[in-house]
Amino acid sequence: MKPIFFSIFTVFLFASCNNSQKVKPFWTEEKSPEVVGQKLIDDFFTRDNFKVIDSYGFTAIHYAEACAAFGVARMADVLNNKQAIQQLADKYMKVITDSIPNTADHVDANVYGILPFELYYLTGETAFLDQAKYLADVQWENPRSDGLSNQTRFWIDDVWMIGSLQTEAYRITKDPVYIERAALEIQAYLKRLQQPNGLFYHGPGIPFCWGRGNGWVAAGLAEVLSELPKENPYYPAILEGYIKMMNALVKYQAPNGMWRQLVDVEEAWYETSSTAMFGYAMLMGVKYGILTDEKYTQTYQKAWLALTDYITNDGKVTDVCIGTGQQNDIDYYLNRPRVTGDFHGQAPTLWFAWALLE
């Protein structure tokens, strides 16, 4: 750790961030984000081994683990849990020192960079910054003729995978090239993929609004808007797409506060990872003064109070949809297995808890 660097850097970063509003507590003690967040941190550190993807033509620490560790870092920071920060830094420094591979040629590999950016912010260890900047920069090493990343797939997941990495790079380095990349990319995805009802199909010719797929979009839009300067030429389009999606989510939230495996299908089961992502995305909009109507506050509050009923005493989120490919068959989505403790559910629950406290 480098405490002198940490204190100076923290003051600089805090002073330069967009202003956000504190959330007034609306929860009981057992549902408090402090209690829930610490449970999820404790659970995270029971998992010793790295979860590695070595398929689909690339190799990297699994994006879901990276997103969960990113959530642990933010949560530990807001709780002032220095032991957890050090433990996290020690664990993921091994990715560098032990040369755990990252082929850095796919959005699911490069998004790992959000974690070392956050660890650099918390510790001042430049090895994390070097690793993170490489993953952000190589994403635009050979851009397409339209300026988009050569990793562009127009899969809805990418709104988070690309948007969060480039936004985090801007947040930490303050180099505007990163947020300009994020804005260019995200407006192109919105223009091509957002449906008239504000939601997103899982894929071309797949007319189903899968919960977690839409969750990646919602969280990614919120992340970009939390840093995107209003004078950016793409700000109006991204803001419009975000608000359009948030209004759809208000409409489709179940009476109990959850969202469903298929967002707009009432017979679909209640799914936690999407609920956490949607709640986080809406909360961020309220905190940054984008969503001012009381209905948005009521919606994210209902989501948190419902979501926390799906967390075990040892900090595992239940009813998480397993990884899901694209299928033109509604029963495929309605019958997907549910698991407990998967990083896809742990990660956004940590983000949501952090945002309630930050």
Task: Name what the model sees in each region.
Residues 128-164:
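Asp-box/WD-like beta-propeller blade repeats and closely related beta-sheet repeat scaffolds
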Residues 59-65, 69-72, 105-120, 154-166, ...:
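Aromatic-lined, polymer-binding surfaces characteristic
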Residues 1-24:
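Bacterial Sec-dependent N-terminal signal peptides
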Residues 37, 41-45, 86-88, 131-145, ...:
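Acidic-glycine-rich active-site phosphate/pyrophosphate-binding loop
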Residues 50-57, 148-149, 201, 205:
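Active-site flanking loop/helix segments enriched in acidic
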Residues 49, 80, 97-101, 124, ...:
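Helix-capping and short linker residues that terminate individual alpha-solenoid repeat units
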Residues 25-66, 78-87, 91-94, 98-123, ...:
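CBM-like carbohydrate-recognition segments
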Residues 156-157, 167-262, 268-279, 291-325, ...:
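Extended ligand-binding clefts on enzyme/binding-domain cores
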